[in-house]
């Protein structure tokens, strides 16, 4: 009798987890789209937008897919970081609170703002400054080997993909100085990967703690 009563409990425990995973992915997607739009507005000051400004007023813009791609990438990164932590057996415990995550987002936006607002002597100085700021963001809010490795991998992959799109005429920047864009793009991708990874980790931890609390109540 006891075994019959306990048998059906497997699927219900799986379904909430799957639903929570989908909700977490959706939230990360929306955050990614929002940050893409905000960061684009910052770059408008230099006329170096990641997609034409009219995307804000029309879904039929020639680059309407760019913020959607950013949202999809943000969801994938945010879900991947906790999975890698579990796979490596290295749960991330450094500064695991929402206030730290919000500061990380603020620093990420600040790095983007610096690339748009501050005038550097040359592109090399811009690259070195943003690289130092991005590594500083990782050291301040992450400090994990998995975070550093994924950040570098994301930066390399995203930069290569963006350049291939430009070279093949699928996409183009609005700036005449293409070298300027390439100077800050890898650093922005790296910092963005670290930021979305921290958000994903925090959401996963919040979900895990909620499930543990619920199991204790039951």
UniProtKB/Swiss-Prot annotation:
Positions on the Lumenal side per record topology: 45-63, 120-122, 169-182
Topology in membrane: Multi-pass membrane protein
Main location: endoplasmic reticulum
Location of the protein in the cell: Endoplasmic reticulum membrane
Keywords: Cholesterol metabolism, Endoplasmic reticulum, Lipid metabolism, Lipid-binding, Membrane, Steroid metabolism, Sterol metabolism, Transmembrane, Transmembrane helix
UniProt-listed InterPro entries: INSIG_fam (IPR025929)
Ranges facing Cytoplasmic side: 1-21, 82-96, 142-146, 201-218
Membrane spanning stretches: 22-44, 64-81, 97-119, 123-141, 147-168, 183-200
Any single GO BP term: cholesterol biosynthetic process
Molecular function via GO: oxysterol binding
Record flagged with keyword Membrane: yes
Extent of motif KxHxx: 212-218
Site (Required for the recognition of 25-hydroxycholesterol): 108
GO CC annotation, single: endoplasmic reticulum membrane
PANTHER family: INSULIN-INDUCED GENE 1, INSULIN-INDUCED GENE 2 PROTEIN
Quaternary structure (record): Interacts with scap; interaction is direct and only takes place in the presence of sterols; it prevents interaction between scap and the coat protein complex II (COPII). Associates with the SCAP-SREBP complex; association is mediated via its interaction with scap and only takes place in the presence of sterols.
Function (record text): Oxysterol-binding protein that mediates feedback control of cholesterol synthesis by controlling both endoplasmic reticulum to Golgi transport of scap and degradation of hmgcr. Acts as a negative regulator of cholesterol biosynthesis by mediating the retention of the SCAP-SREBP complex in the endoplasmic reticulum, thereby blocking the processing of sterol regulatory element-binding proteins (SREBPs).
Family to which the UniProt record says this protein belongs: Belongs to the INSIG family.
UniProt free text on domains: Binds oxysterols in a pocket within their transmembrane domains and interacts with scap via transmembrane domains 3 and 4. The KxHxx motif mediates association with the coatomer complex.
Protein name according to UniProt: Insulin-induced gene 2 protein
Gene symbol of the encoding locus: insig2
């Amino acid at each position: 009798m006891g075994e019959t009563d306990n048998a059906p409990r497997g699927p219900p425990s799986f379904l909430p987890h799957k639903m929570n995973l989908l909700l977490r992915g959706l939230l990360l997607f929306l955050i990614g789209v929002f940050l893409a739009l905000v960061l684009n507005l910052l770059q408008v000051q230099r006329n170096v937008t990641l997609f034409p400004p009219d995307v804000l007023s029309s879904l039929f813009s020639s680059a309407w897919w760019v913020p959607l791609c950013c949202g999809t990438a943000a969801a994938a990164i945010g879900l991947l970081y906790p999975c890698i932590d579990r796979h490596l057996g290295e749960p991330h415990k450094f500064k695991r609170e929402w206030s730290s995550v919000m500061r990380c987002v603020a620093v990420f936006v600040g790095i983007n703002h610096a690339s748009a607002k501050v005038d550097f002597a040359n592109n090399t100085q811009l690259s070195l400054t943003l690289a130092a700021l991005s590594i500083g963001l990782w050291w301040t809010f992450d400090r994990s080997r998995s975070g550093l490795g994924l950040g570098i991998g994301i930066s390399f992959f995203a930069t290569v993909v963006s350049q291939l799109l430009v070279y093949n005429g699928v996409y183009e920047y609005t700036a005449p100085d293409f070298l300027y864009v390439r100077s800050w793009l890898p650093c922005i991708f790296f910092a963005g990967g670290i930021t979305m990874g921290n958000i994903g980790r925090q959401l996963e931890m919040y979900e895990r703690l909620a499930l543990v609390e619920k199991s204790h109540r039951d």
